[in-house]
């Protein structure tokens, strides 16, 4: 009987020493983690590490592309200079004229690439892809598009500058450099605006995209400067050499009419854009009447004159131009 009692106590003691249920015991959090949890946690760390490594790899690749673009531009400018003996190494000191000459060569390369890219705009739009195709056709590697950090706007701005220069050259020929008096200044203005808008015709389908790029805040100063400079040149060669308030109202009015006509032009489907040119002529006639009304209002003349004068000077400074047309 004593042995039975001892055995009974031993069984009770053994039960007390057995591990408690993991689901109900306070010691459950101290139990070892399942192997699947450890694997999942390890996999999560590996995934984060892989994402970080991918990010670093992308950034390093972009940095290499930028370096390659700079090197390509350097080699291209040396090639244009016949070996680049005057450019020197990056670490060597250079004088101001040498820097200007180097920048001029880079600008020439940019212009060459952008000229070639224009033929791809009807298919690619005003995009970086068009610039890449233009670079490849010009004999430069595709990574040279790094020379154009502004993207498609560089192409639009180049096109506008090129067209403006062509128009000014045409106006100079018609007026003998501004020396010959224009018989009908109003018709001269109408024909000048028409000639400028007709240059957009090959790119009419994608021109809304170009206008959107020009309207972006970071591009607005250059875009506005190109417009103000163009209307100033048109008015100058039309014979407008006055220094009164009309000098400003005519230029601002012409810029407004140009933009209105440009929007009408994009929606016009008439043969030869005949309705656009009728719209342009009507707006010009209205502008003449408005200018006559404003010329009779002397109260705000000086205020407007100071504001407009500052705007036109700023526009030419942005483009690196002056008022010397000789």
UniProtKB/Swiss-Prot annotation:
Coiled-coil parts of chain: none
Location of the region described as Disordered in the Swiss-Prot/TrEMBL record: 49-103
Segment annotated as transit peptide: 1-43
InterPro entries the record matches: COQ9_C, COQ9_HTH, Ubiq_biosynth_COQ9
Domain of life (superkingdom): Eukaryota
Binding site for a 1,2-diacylglycero-3-phosphoethanolamine: 248-251
Biological process according to GO: ubiquinone biosynthetic process
Biased composition (Basic and acidic residues): 49-78
Family named by the database record: Belongs to the COQ9 family.
UniProt protein name: Ubiquinone biosynthesis protein COQ9, mitochondrial
Organism: Drosophila melanogaster (Fruit fly)
Biological classification of the source: Eukaryota, Metazoa, Ecdysozoa, Arthropoda, Hexapoda
